[in-house]
Amino acid sequence: MTKYLLDTDICIFFIRGKYKVREKVYDIKSENCFVSEITLAELKYGAEKSDNYEKHAAEADYIARIFTVVPIIEHLDQFAKEKVRLQRAGTLIPDFDLLIGTTAVSGNFILVTNNEKHLSRIENIHIENWRKARFNGFLNGK
């Protein structure tokens, strides 16, 4: 079965009920969807700086409960190699994006993100953008 690594922006769309991301997760089953521990860290950071900490912290905890959280330790060699490659090419991307993206590559995930601009620079990455995707014959977008 195909495995999907959900980027932080997609998790936020899921939480907010935007772009039919929830429907897509339900269609493919949540057990086939994963999040990086970096995504979880970004969600917790967002909660911490929010004016509504309790709500956003609960949302981050919910994401951690319904999706398997993938540790980055096994993917750090891929991160280091890809960072050097991008640096030499003069096309670096933020480390958190690179950690999430290289986790997708080395873990054989399809990365689901709305951040195609940065993440498509990663070699051998497979990306889907569920914000732009078509489900049930209708173009998504709220």
Where are these regions (language model features)?
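Active-site neighborhoods of divalent-metal-dependent phosphate/nucleic-acid chemistry enzymes
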Residues: 68-114
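Generic structural signal for small/hydrophobic residues in well-ordered secondary structure
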Residues: 7-8, 43, 79, 104, ...
